[in-house]
Amino acid sequence: MTQLINPSKFTNTVGLLRSFFLDKGFLEVHTQNRLSILAACEDPFNVAIYNYAGQVWPLPQTGQMWLEHELLSQPDSKGFFCVSTSYRQEPNAIPGRHDIIFPMFEFEMPGSVDDLKAMEYELCEYLGFGNITEKTYAEWQQHFGLSADTEMEAEHELAMEKEFGQTLITNFPELTSPFWNMALSLIHI
């Protein structure tokens, strides 16, 4: 079930995130009032709906598509970010891992995947996280003794955090159902 969030921690965390991106010239986008079926693109099997102004809409799961819309509308921008509420009607929510309603901070920026990774590392350093252990999905599978066609589960993610602290997973294979807009690597096809 969804837990109450400590207002002091929320204020401090969102303040740090806002400061980081505003200092880089990003603009904040209010996405929560935009009605769209695209706001429910994370997992179609846990979409909740509501009736508003005589039409049925999905409760938003992400502001990603609106951030991408702004980025495409203003390609010379530094980037965009939003703070929104995500609604995920998880049928098998894992306590401590899944909240069915939670605040989410997202950003989009122009550039390559290497630019994105550099930004993520810089953000983690700014927020005070320690060293980050980075491995490809295949390397993490090998670490846990999983075959290449076996998807990692929540238990593996928890073990990563316990053993390594902060981690980064790259190069997600097709078996993990990556987002439809992610680049496809033809290396292993």
Question: Which residues does each predicted region cover?
Answer:
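Generic amphipathic alpha-helical segments used as scaffolds and interaction surfaces in large
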Residues: 4-8, 12, 57, 108-114, ...
